[in-house]
Amino acid sequence: MLSAGLGLLMLVAVVEFLIGLIGNGSLVVWSFREWIRKFNWSSYNLIILGLAGCRFLLQWLIILDLSLFPLFQSSRWLRYLSIFWVLVSQASLWFATFLSVFYCKKITTFDRPAYLWLKQRAYNLSLWCLLGYFIINLLLTVQIGLTFYHPPQGNSSIRYPFESWQYLYAFQLNSGSYLPLVVFLVSSGMLIVSLYTHHKKMKVHSAGRRDVRAKAHITALKSLGCFLLLHLVYIMASPFSITSKTYPPDLTSVFIWETLMAAYPSLHSLILIMGIPRVKQTCQKILWKTVCARRCWGP
């Protein structure tokens, strides 16, 4: 018999799953639609497609974990599911980092020669460097997940409490998030500085005029700021989700922490859609056509 609190958490988890499914699915459809319309992949479309695809997978992994954990608490497959979960989560962070670098390249308005050189050369170089780092981290994560899953046993001279070892396990699996998070923060900081300098120029030269570039700055910063907040909640809830599964497992705690984690892939997709007029209009058309088709084919 489920308690009322656990039933409410399950309802919230399902709602978050449906929001993420619709939001990220709409972004994936929009990206493919743009490709079919133009027969050319732009950097922005590729980033949005990768980001939405990772979030789509992340939503499924969270709901699978919540569904399977009560039934298969000691199964080896849950170990593999957790490793894949970490990889998809880190890939999502990488694509968000690519998005922040893309915004920084397209929107910032510094006039210094060093920055102009960096803007022209370092964008592609940073993407290749981040991609290489991601591949290395993928291999390390798989190795850690497969060989460092059980705490020391027997007569080992070094012994960890099970909960402490689980925190160490979470720390090692998430170690690949640090570099992309630093790049993300640097890019976002450059956007903030660029907005500040641009705002000072506009106050002097064109008071009262409509400032399109400032609006682009603010839209990008809203998206990146919401992502950072949701990602920090996700990162802070992750270790508690792991330790709540230790013996004896606390199912209510698992649902609390993973429901908080599920807000990251579901809500940020809506923020992306609402912040980009083209995507918002396209997604509205897609959803309207889906509803109309459902009414036509429904009973």
Swiss-Prot record:
Q: In which tissues is it expressed?
A: Expressed in subsets of taste receptor cells of the tongue and palate epithelium and exclusively in gustducin-positive cells.
The record's similarity note reads: Belongs to the G-protein coupled receptor T2R family.
| Alphabetical UniProt keywords | G-protein coupled receptor, Glycoprotein, Membrane, Receptor, Sensory transduction, Taste, Transducer, Transmembrane, Transmembrane helix
Q: Which residues cross the membrane?
A: 2-22, 46-66, 83-103, 128-148, 176-196, 224-244, 254-274
Coding gene?
TAS2R5
Report the protein name in the record. Taste receptor type 2 member 5
Q: Give the miscellaneous note.
A: Most taste cells may be activated by a limited number of bitter compounds; individual taste cells can discriminate among bitter stimuli.
Pfam families per the UniProt record, alphabetical: TAS2R
- Residue intervals on the Cytoplasmic side: 23-45, 104-127, 197-223, 275-299
